[in-house]
C-alpha cells in the first residue's frame, strides 16, 4: 500500500493551526479506505498525494487536515473555493527553512528570562570567549520573527478591497494580532536581514515572542500555512485543469461534466447527472469501469466538500451531511467473517446512516458479489426497496446483474446509466 499519512505532528500544531469552529461532513474509515484518501490500496495513489506539494511542512499537515475532514458548511466551503480561485494569491512571507527555524525556536527548551541590560552585556562578554549555539538559536529566531511580522504587515496593506473573504480575514487577523498588541513595536524595525539587533533587543523580544505573545505568533503562523494550502491547491487546479469552484447547493441537484478519476492515465472524461429519483444504477459487464466511475464521482463530491478543486470541468453538488461507500470490503479469518457477511454488515451500517434523517451520499458497488447470482439478485432487490424510502439521500449503485436493473427499469425512484 502507498501511504502518505504523516508520521508525527508538532506538539502544538493541532492546538493552534486546525480550526475548532468548523462543522464537518460525517464519514468513516471504510469510506476513506475505499476512496484511498490517505492510503492507497492495490498500489493506488492516495488522493492526498495530489495536494501534498506544499511549500512548508505544516502546510502539508494543514492540507492533510483539509482533505481528511470534509465540511458540510456551505459558507466555509465557498470561502475556501474563492480563495483558491483568486489569481492574485500572495506569496509566503518567508521560505520553508526560515519558517521551520521559527517553529524550532518557539519550541526551544531553555530558561527564558526577563530582559535586563546588565545580563545582556554579561552574556555578550561570555560569547566572545566561546561559541554559544543556544544564543544563535535565540538571535536568529527573534530576527526571523521580526522580519516575518514586517512582511505580514506589508501583506495586510497590499490586500485588495475585492479580495476573497478568506484573504480579507487573513488581513484583519494580521491587523488585530500585530497592531492590537505589543508586537506592533517591531513594525519598521530591522526589515533587512543584514541589520542585526542588539543583545538587549534580542532578549527583550525573545521574552515578548516566547512568553507574552507565544499564542499570537502561533496564530499568525497558522494563517501562513493556510495561505500555503490555498496556493498549492490553486497550483494543482491550474496544472491539471481541475474546477476550483463547484457550485454548492442546498438542493439535491448533483451533476458533473468532464469528470475523470484523478489517477486514471489518459482517462476519458464523462458527464453525469443524478436524475429524478434518489437511486442511480450503473450497469455494465465486469471490467467495464463501473467501480472507477463510482470512485471518480465520489472523489469529486468529497473534494468539493473539502473546498478543494475537483477533477472535472464543472460541477453542481449538494451539501451532504455524510458520505458512505461499500466498495472494497475485507473478509476476516480472525473473526470468521466471510466477504458475504462483511457486505451484509456494511449495508446494514449504511442503512442506519440513511435512517438517521441526515442527507447522505451512499455508494454501493456490486452488492452481494460474495454469493451466487440468484441470491445476489434477490438480496439486491430487497435492499433497493428499502433505499426508495430515504428520499433525503442519494444512492449510486453499480451492478452487472442485468435482471436486477430490469426489475426497476420502470420505477420512478430509479434511473440508469
Kindly label every feature range from the protein language model.
Residues 3, 8, 12, 16-18:
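Short, positively charged and aromatic/hydrophobic N-terminal segments
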Residues 21-182, 216, 220-226, 259:
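Conserved amphipathic alpha-helical "coupling/scaffold" segments
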Residues 47-52, 63-66, 204-212, 284, ...:
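Short hinge/gating elements
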Residues 85, 228, 348-351:
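Structural signal for well-ordered, non-membrane alpha-helices
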Residues 155-161, 236-245:
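Long amphipathic alpha-helical segments
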Residues 181-205:
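Extended, charged coiled-coil "arm/hinge" scaffolds of SMC/Rad50-like chromosome-maintenance ATPases
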Residues 198-242:
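Charged, surface-exposed helical/loop "interaction arms" that form contiguous linear patches used
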Residues 240-417:
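ATPase nucleotide-binding head domains, primarily ABC-like/P-loop NTPase cores
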Amino acid at each position: 500500500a502507498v501511504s502518505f499519512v504523516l508520521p508525527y505532528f508538532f506538539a502544538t500544531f493541532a492546538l493552534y493551526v486546525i480550526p475548532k469552529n468548523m462543522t464537518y461532513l460525517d464519514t468513516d474509515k471504510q469510506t476513506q479506505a475505499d476512496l484511498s484518501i490517505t492510503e492507497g490500496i492495490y498500489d493506488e495513489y492516495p488522493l492526498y498525494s495530489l495536494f501534498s506539494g506544499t511549500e512548508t511542512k505544516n502546510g502539508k499537515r494543514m492540507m492533510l487536515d483539509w482533505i481528511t475532514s470534509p465540511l458540510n458548511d456551505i459558507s466555509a466551503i465557498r470561502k475556501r473555493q474563492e480563495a483558491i480561485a483568486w489569481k492574485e494569491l500572495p506569496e509566503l512571507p518567508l521560505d520553508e527553512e526560515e519558517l521551520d527555524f521559527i517553529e524550532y525556536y518557539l519550541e526551544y527548551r531553555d530558561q527564558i528570562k526577563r530582559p535586563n541590560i546588565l545580563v545582556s552585556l554579561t552574556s555578550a562578554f561570555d560569547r566572545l570567549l566561546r561559541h554559544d549555539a543556544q544564543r544563535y538559536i535565540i538571535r536568529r529566531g527573534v530576527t526571523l520573527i521580526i522580519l516575518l511580522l514586517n512582511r505580514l504587515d506589508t501583506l495586510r496593506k497590499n490586500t485588495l478591497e475585492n479580495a476573497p473573504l478568506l484573504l480579507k480575514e487573513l488581513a484583519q487577523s494580521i491587523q488585530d494580532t500585530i497592531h492590537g498588541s505589543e508586537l506592533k513595536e517591531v513594525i519598521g524595525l530591522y526589515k533587512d536581514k543584514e541589520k542585526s539587533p542588539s543583545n538587549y533587543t534580542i532578549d527583550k523580544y525573545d521574552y515578548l515572542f516566547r512568553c507574552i505573545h507565544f499564542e499570537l505568533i502561533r496564530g499568525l503562523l497558522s494563517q501562513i500555512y493556510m495561505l500555503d494550502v490555498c496556493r498549492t491547491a490553486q497550483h494543482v487546479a491550474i496544472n491539471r485543469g481541475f474546477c476550483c469552484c463547484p457550485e454548492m447547493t442546498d438542493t439535491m441537484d448533483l451533476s458533473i461534466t468532464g469528470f475523470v478519476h484523478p489517477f486514471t492515465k489518459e482517462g476519458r472524461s464523462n458527464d453525469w447527472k443524478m436524475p429524478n429519483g434518489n437511486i442511480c444504477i450503473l450497469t455494465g459487464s465486469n471490467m467495464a469501469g463501473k467501480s472507477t466511475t463510482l470512485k471518480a464521482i465520489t472523489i469529486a463530491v468529497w473534494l468539493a466538500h473539502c473546498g478543494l478543486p475537483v477533477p472535472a470541468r464543472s460541477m453542481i453538488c449538494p451539501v451532504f451531511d455524510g458520505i458512505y461507500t461499500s466498495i472494497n470490503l475485507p473478509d476476516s479469518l480472525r473473526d470468521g467473517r466471510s466477504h458475504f457477511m462483511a457486505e451484509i454488515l456494511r449495508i446494514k451500517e449504511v442503512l442506519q446512516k440513511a435512517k438517521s434523517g441526515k442527507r447522505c451520499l451512499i455508494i454501493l458497488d456490486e452488492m452481494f458479489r460474495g454469493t451466487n447470482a440468484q441470491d445476489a439478485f434477490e438480496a439486491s432487490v430487497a435492499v433497493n426497496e428499502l433505499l426508495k424510502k430515504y428520499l433525503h439521500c442519494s444512492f449510486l449503485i453499480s451492478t452487472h446483474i442485468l435482471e436486477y436493473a430490469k426489475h426497476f427499469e420502470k420505477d420512478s425512484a430509479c434511473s440508469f446509466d
